[in-house]
A protein has these predicted regions:
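A sequence/structural signal for flexible, mid-protein segments enriched
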Residues: 21-287
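Sec-dependent bacterial lipoprotein signal peptides
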Residues: 1-19
Length: 287
């Protein structure tokens, strides 16, 4: 037995050496420009600029992610009146933790905003229009009958808006005990035909990539800040593909390996104008 082990050792060493010489098949993937940006009615633009992280067989560290942030990009937002270069700054609690913004241009419903990003060799452009502002008439907040630790939210909307072609409505939210930034509400996207007189639209829990025990309802520890927005056609298409990806990512029967339907020419990502209204909700009294 000892002799067999000694004879096998050189083969094992050779196998390890051979494996170390095998080239990572994804190591030469060319990075692409990635733009994530939005401008709300009555608020200032926010833009993040990175390069795509290639598929790889090796582990990815936080250092690797930071190296994909393009801090020296020139980011410009233009409307019908002026063109403004945004200022780069550290943004704590964001991913990535560095972005671009300005107080010299503010979103207004009915106005169109062009985004330009230059960081040689990359150049990207995108255009978005902020639709009329969405308004919720009232919210109904009720305990869940099946679980006394959870509650559910319904939004009552009667407003009929003339939205851009292909546009729609979306809910975002913040749980004040857990979040700093808005997150997408699960299945929170609605077409105009869903907004009939006095409908009750369910507002589901927030999508968190690290949440392995998801419930569509909210915990009694959640004090909510809900943003109800209108979207133009390209913005709706992006969030529609995002929700498809989230919904199907856990299914073994459907593939979700396609890119999201962004509206950035010259790169990946989105530039969205939001006609937004913000509401604060408290948990109901426990039954």
């Amino acid at each position: 037995m000892v002799v067999l082990c000694k004879n096998a050792l050189p083969l094992l060493v050779a196998a390890i050496a051979l494996a170390s010489c095998v080239e990572d098949p994804y190591s030469h993937t060319q990075p692409q420009l990635v733009v994530e940006g939005w401008i709300d009615d009555g608020d200032f633009p926010t833009v993040f600029v990175t390069t795509s992280l290639p598929f790889t067989t090796s582990d990815t560290t936080d250092v690797d992610l930071v190296q994909h942030v393009l801090k020296w990009a020139t980011v410009t937002v233009s409307d019908e009146e002026k063109s403004v270069v945004l200022t780069g700054r550290v943004m704590k609690h964001q991913t990535p933790p560095y972005g671009f913004t300005t107080t010299r241009i503010m979103g207004r419903s009915g106005h169109t905003y062009k985004l330009t990003v230059d960081c040689p060799p990359y150049h990207a452009e995108a255009v978005t229009t902020i639709p009329p502002k969405a308004v919720v008439d009232s919210f109904t907040v009720t305990p869940c009958l099946e679980n006394d630790t959870l509650y559910q939210v319904m939004a009552h909307v009667s407003q009929q808006l003339d939205l851009p072609q292909g546009g729609g409505y979306k809910f975002f939210g913040i749980s004040k005990c857990r979040d700093v930034n808005y997150k997408s509400c699960y299945m929170g996207l609605y077409k105009p035909e869903n907004i009939s007189p006095h409908p009750a639209l369910p507002v589901y829990n927030l999508h968190r990539p690290d949440n392995r025990h998801f419930s569509p309802f909210f915990s009694y520890s959640d004090t909510l800040k809900i943003k109800f927005t209108t979207l133009d056609g390209p913005s709706y298409a992006f969030w529609d593909s995002f929700e498809d990806d989230v919904s199907l990512s856990g299914s073994p029967f459907f593939s979700t390996n396609s890119n999201l339907r962004g509206n950035v020419s010259g790169g990946l990502g989105y530039w969205c104008g939001y006609g937004s209204s913000v509401y604060y909700l408290l948990p109901p009294k426990k039954p």
